[in-house]
């Protein structure tokens, strides 16, 4: 099982959501410590080691460091726009 980091990022995002949606996202995030690269994950172009998984209408962006067996959740955001990618770019630049 991988270590899971960045849960405070997830919890902050979940506060404003409906409980059912928040639970779906939380379940998806927690599953990453068991399977850091699930079949539905996609590696982000231009960001080595960064991946995304979708949970309903939301994107979960995380970094997987296999040498440390660490999953770090970086961002969670809506899928209907590219704001989450812009936030990632600002965060890493």
PLM region spans:
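Enriched for short, Lys/Arg-rich terminal
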Residues: 1, 55, 63-93
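Arg/Lys-rich, positively charged N-terminal/basic patches that mediate binding to nucleic acids
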Residues: 1-28
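Residues that form or immediately flank small-molecule/cofactor binding pockets and catalytic motifs
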Residues: 9, 49, 78
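Short aromatic/hydrophobic contact patches that present stacked aromatics
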Residues: 11, 50-52, 61
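Active-site micro-motifs of SAM-dependent methyltransferase domains
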Residues: 12, 31, 81
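Alpha-helix boundary/capping and short turn/kink residues
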Residues: 18-22, 34, 38, 78
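A short, surface-exposed loop/turn module that caps and links secondary-structure elements
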Residues: 27-53
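ATP phosphate-binding glycine-rich loop
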Residues: 58
